[in-house]
Amino acid sequence: MSEWGKMSLFRLSLLLLFAVTPFAAIAAPPALIPIPASTRALEGKFRITERTGVEGKGLAAPTAAYLAKALGLTAGKRNGSRIRLNLVGEKIVPGAEAYRLTVEPDEIRIEASDARGLFYGAQTLRQLVSKSRDGSQVIPAIRIEDSPRFRWRGLLVDVARHFFGKPELLKIIDEMAAYKLNVLKLHLTDYEGWRLEIPGYPKLTEVGALVDGKPRYFTTADMREIVQYAADRHIMVVPEIEMPGHAGAAARAYPEFFNDAGGAFNPANPKAYDFIRSVLSEVARIFPAPYLHFGGDEVGDDVWKGMADVDRLKAEQGLKTTDDVEAYFGRKVVGVIESLGKRALAWDEQVDAKAPKTVVIQWWRRDRPDVLEAAARDGYELVLSPADHLYFDYHQGEGEPGAPWEGNKGGPQSIAKVLAWEPVPDSFTPEQSARVLGIEACAWTEFIETERYLQFMIFPRLLALAEIAWRPKGPRDEAEFSTRLEPHIEALRAKGINARRGEWDAYEFITN
């Protein structure tokens, strides 16, 4: 009998349990993801009743209301047992995003020195809830002290190649919040589509967003709603507007700003920079995040070949190669971004282009560890997204679907492979390690056309990402993690999320 057959009855029982539980963790010790830094079991259980109150004042009130709704309770003081959320001083709970959770039979306390910590403590509490035999919700008595390893715990969703709209993103945001991820990067523009309304440039969406003859994009109102929904869950939404390359959709709309082939901005055209400033100014107004990603990757050597105005620019500025021209363009764009009060992010090709040290570098080229080492040595802050561990368009098992890129030939990008990755190289000095802001997985969608397929590729690898991003550095046991993971997969599926169970026959759920 296959593993699927052996586990089917167990999975069915879990499914029935999760269908009636806000969020369950039924293993002992609790099957928490990500695993906390410190846990200590106490005596007894806390029983949730209709008289249980969820209390939080001031900055704690929003999380108290969120938690009360998740548990089917009413926020505020009641005449029964209580769940208290308190903001305390740094000396009591030190560290940004840290929390202390204490569950006793008559009271639950979540304490943190900032609102984010309270929110993450609430997420851990939700995972501790289970159903007792009499149908009531119970939580084991426990004391947890916890804080994240990395401050950047992200997921990139490519909505340019294939469009995924507000309903799809809100579901992803909910699950990111549940697992303490805090950055959603939206790849909004590429060859296939421009997906954000920009007032004053209607052709960006009228022409650049066409799918089967119909424009598919986010209105500014839709995007503001997504950004606020994420912010309410302590998730920062970072926009990516690709340039100079990966810009075919914008070139179809406004070819006068681009090279002759129509795939990259013309760095010699002053009006192109006016266009960029206008567009990025609007983007900066929509997204309050302090970061703006401008791409800066995969520019071909011949992209500006034979363009007389670019040749003149090279002569005037002393630029000899395509890399030199790209570096010139990048410096101009970084200047625009910084003038808007934002900090620029870019892919790791910008290390080769000698981008200003204020740029945050996102390393993705797993075959170029030398670039990562150079970026660390040169003083850049870093977000790590190596393709061979964190590209969620890569296949998860032998024979399964996935992007057919050259870098996808090192075997399946399984849960085990994700977990095996240690983000910070041993060669990094303490100072260099401190400049690693965190990690970010990338769900590219060239070959992902439906929401069910997208979910299949993201889940449950997203939970392995959360484990690496949050838990302290140290060895990770894939078998132990898989034991904790099992009930979470069933919880996701009970909510309608098409999480992969680990068997190839689950592929039927992509298309059904």
Q: Positions of the model-derived regions?
A:
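Feature activates predominantly on carbohydrate-active enzymes
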Residues: I92-Y291, M307, K332, V336, ...
